[in-house]
Amino acid sequence: MALWLPGGQLTLLLLLWVQQTPAGSTEAPLKVDVDLTPDSFDDQYQGCSEQMVEELNQGDYFIKEVDTHKYYSRAWQKAHLTWLNQAKALPESMTPVHAVAIVVFTLNLNVSSDLAKAMARAAGSPGQYSQSFHFKYLHYYLTSAIQLLRKDSSTKNGSLCYKVYHGMKDVSIGANVGSTIRFGQFLSASLLKEETRVSGNQTLFTIFTCLGASVQDFSLRKEVLIPPYELFEVVSKSGSPKGDLINLRSAGNMSTYNCQLLKACSKKCAPAPVVIGCLFLVTVVISSKSRAQRNLLAPF
């Protein structure tokens, strides 16, 4: 996970840096600036959840994404079986698809990395989103899952914020105290500071998030998933021999997009017959675990 440069290119820079920097390298940390990530795909789907689910099903978006990403079907199969083995009661309105979306994101590095890159560079405009953003299904269900988990937690515990930690190795962040930033991606952050420690130089974020949701019931780790649209104020920044320490405090939210898939389809999509286009959706609602396992593997 990483922050973005203007234009959404920081993800690629960081990936190249990690791939090209050997373990134990003494090279100077990569220095990057942060901003509000204006080009990141940040849809909150406010007021259109039911319509989004209908469009995703009718448009066979899951199948389209499976066809685009060669590892995708196997990642979802594995995540589905993982969820079946640990399935717990879900909050109101949350479905097994929401749960498996969290599992596939938190457990599969290829999925989370490619989603981050797509959010940065494949949705800079409505037209680009429509043609080039091939994570419409996953993006919606991750966003919706965070919102539903927060709603459930708020109902039980009132307004809920989390103090979490996220570390980035060999990266020096240029962020001024008092400035407002956002990550522009789904960021997994740990509730345990010790889990973020790595060898070498590291930028450690201490994040006070009020829009993130605890996903430890799904990922089996004490972590919180922060949505791409949450804003943060840089409260403090200090240096140490092991790297920078940056404290962030939630400062609301900001989105450029809302219900973008529906807007795109209202312009060019012909009405489709009501069918369950996503075979994955069929399998996850089967109550029998053994039957679900047989049916999950069959379509792929």
UniProtKB/Swiss-Prot annotation:
Glycans are attached at N110, N157, N201, N253. Residues 265-300 form a propeptide. Gene3D superfamilies: Toxin ADP-ribosyltransferase, Chain A, domain 1. The gene is Art4. The chain crosses the membrane at residues 270-286. Pfam families: ART (PF01129). PANTHER family: ADP-RIBOSYLTRANSFERASE, ECTO-ADP-RIBOSYLTRANSFERASE 4. Residues 287-300 are cytoplasmic. It catalyses: L-arginyl-[protein] + NAD(+) = N(omega)-(ADP-D-ribosyl)-L-arginyl-[protein] + nicotinamide + H(+). InterPro entries: ADP-ribosyltransferase_ARG, ART. NAD(+) binds at Q185, S219. Residues 1-23 form the signal peptide. Its EC number is 2.4.2.31. This is Ecto-ADP-ribosyltransferase 4. Residues 24-269 are extracellular. It comes from Mus musculus (Mouse). Disulfide bonds join C48-C259, C161-C210.
